[in-house]
Amino acid sequence: MTHIRRFAILALMFFTMLAVKGQVGESRSRLGVGVNGGMAFNTISFDPTIKQFQHKGLSFGLSMRYTCEKYFTTICALQAEINYTQLGWKEEILDAYGAELEDTYQRDMNYIQLPLLCRLGWGKESGGLQFFILLGPQFGYYISSSAKQSDIWTLNSEGHPNRPNNVYQQYDMKDPDNKFEYGLTGGLGLEFSTKHGQHIMVDGRYYYGLSDILDNGKKDVFARSAHMTISARLTYLFDLFNK
């Protein structure tokens, strides 16, 4: 039921964004399409905690933006993307007593992601700069993964990896239990628009995962295992129409 409630909140949030178009203001009808690319810096929010470095990966895909209204000084738009993103985690490995080990482990996970964003901007619509914020739900679907493990692999007396709180079950994962994931994303950025309908944007975002990649039942090891992502992105759009 928890996942159903979370999904209902996301759906309500998105339909609230759509209602922006119904506000009283100066009507706009501008559709821009293009491409985006950048970097994703990811960790997994594990409970019990696993100490990690930032996992670095690429993120790129297609972007679409529909500008529907200018409400006083606020330019209102809906933005959707379909992106290929490299996520995962990279462990900072300690032994059961908290001492650093030479062991290394990294899990690379590839996703197709669909952010559906409300975009509010202030500044020039063409021929200048515009500041904007983004907020909305994001959905993802797992495609594949791979692991990188050092030749040095420290074991305890029972033959298991020597780790804090005896937590090592993450190494047994071949694929996540839950391939579909969702959460909330938000960010801010700057856009430069030409007078000929071309737009270059740079933004930074934070994604907070609401779903777990591993099962979290009473008999499972992890109570939580969700993606947490900081990303930086460059986007190029050109207007298909501007009415």
Which role fits each region the language model picked out?
Residues 1-30, 36, 234-243:
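Bacterial Sec-dependent N-terminal signal peptides
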Residues 23-31, 69-76, 123-130, 194-199, ...:
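Short loop/turn motifs that connect adjacent beta-strands in outer-membrane beta-barrel proteins
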Residues 23-65, 177:
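Short glycine/proline- and aromatic-enriched beta-strand/turn motifs that initiate or cap beta-hairpins
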Residues 28, 181, 186-243:
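Predominantly the C-terminal beta-signal and adjacent terminal strand-loop region
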Residues 35-39, 60-66, 84, 114-122, ...:
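Residues on the lipid-exposed face of transmembrane beta-strands in outer-membrane beta-barrel proteins
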Residues 43-55, 87-112, 142-181, 212-229:
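Extracellular/periplasm-exposed beta-strand and loop segments of Gram-negative cell-envelope proteins
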Residues 65-77, 85-90:
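N-terminal hydrophobic signal/anchor transmembrane helix of membrane proteins
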Residues 102-144:
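Hydrophobic, well-structured mid-protein blocks that either form specific transmembrane helices
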